[in-house]
Amino acid sequence: MHSIFSDGEFSPSELIEIAEKNEVSVLSLTDHDTFEGIPEFLQSAEETGITAFPGIEITVKFHDFNIHLLAYFKDYESLNPELKDRVKIMTDTREKRMCQLIERIDGVIPDRYRGTLKLENVKRAAEGVLARPHLAREMVRLGIVSSTGQAFERYLVKYN
């Protein structure tokens, strides 16, 4: 599952709550390129008795392909520090890409909205790792588009 720490709609605690209501007994959190939601996920799972598998979805470039690699951890607490450092670098790279995407979109949106898309606002909405759905929500909030689907159709797919 993905949480608000990447491109999901719910917090890690809310995911556990939804799983519990639907009688799910095992759940994994694998946000894109971040471990930020794992502590909350593990704590909430422990409180409900749901078996939790922490993980991460890492985007790996292989030749001209992006591959989404899922990694699961038996013991999150003893994770390799080098992996944590590498994930931090990936987060920083994701932020740079978001800045570039905002610049490209700012150049093609209607004139009255130019300059209104700000990285800080997208980051605040993201609560974690930046992803295109967070930018889409900010575009809806600003009135640039009427829905996140429209943001993707008109801008995010085309100018990514």
Each model region followed by its residue ranges:
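Extended substrate/RNA-proximal surfaces in nucleic-acid metabolism proteins
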Residues: 46-160
